[in-house]
Amino acid sequence: LRLVALDDAAPHWLFTAATWSQLPAAMLLILSFEAERGITAAALAIPWAAVAGVTALYGVQRVLRDGFKPAWKLALNSGLIFVAVGGLWTVASRYGLRPFDFSDTIVLLTGAHFHYAGFILPVLAGLVARANTQRVFDAAAYGVIAAVPLTAVGITLSPPVEVFAALLLATCGFCIAFGQLLVARSAKRSLASLLLALSSLSLMLAMTLATIYAITEFRGARWPQIPDMARWHGTLNALGTCLLGVWAWTLEGPKDPQ
């Protein structure tokens, strides 16, 4: 959140509310996963969904203020909005709801998807597009914004759309990874440079797995299987791409083109 709001002249009250409440809400969410699915688990997850909702309102406020250009701002703001979907699906998972008759696993993974691919990846895309003047990074930012909801639509309604969205997201992911490597070359801190490189490598590996999975599932011979995707793709995205990437950009700070 702070990476998104660094250019604001003064913190918006929605930003302040989200930042102050996110830690206690996150701790309650952890407790939610210690409880059996049901009312108690859902109640413990609701504060996190509320934080995600406030974050989304902050994103809407920024879109109304900034408009749809430049691409890097729209990517940052879109990430703020998409996280609300992740919060809602997380509550649904903890309660035991199965929207669209999805399995419990898919409901949980959808919540996770909108926190990482839906929230953090657009933020990384925005930071990369801001730091590099090449238009390909603007295109990657717009592509991520489109691919996140398209993936959800494809999973729900249309396998061909799902494959297209997965390939689009993977292509944009590779562009973002390359952009982070360019930033790493000129990073002021060696630790930030290393973290950006590791984040980029993780992103490329994760997107390779996602591409293979989407194509093989469409052809009726899914590989890797969902538990393996959750283990490898999920871990690469959560701990590699996102954690290391956010850590690196926090150290380095948003960069304008040199």
Where are the regions a protein language model picked out?
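Hydrophobic alpha-helical transmembrane segments of multi-pass integral membrane proteins
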Residues: 1-258
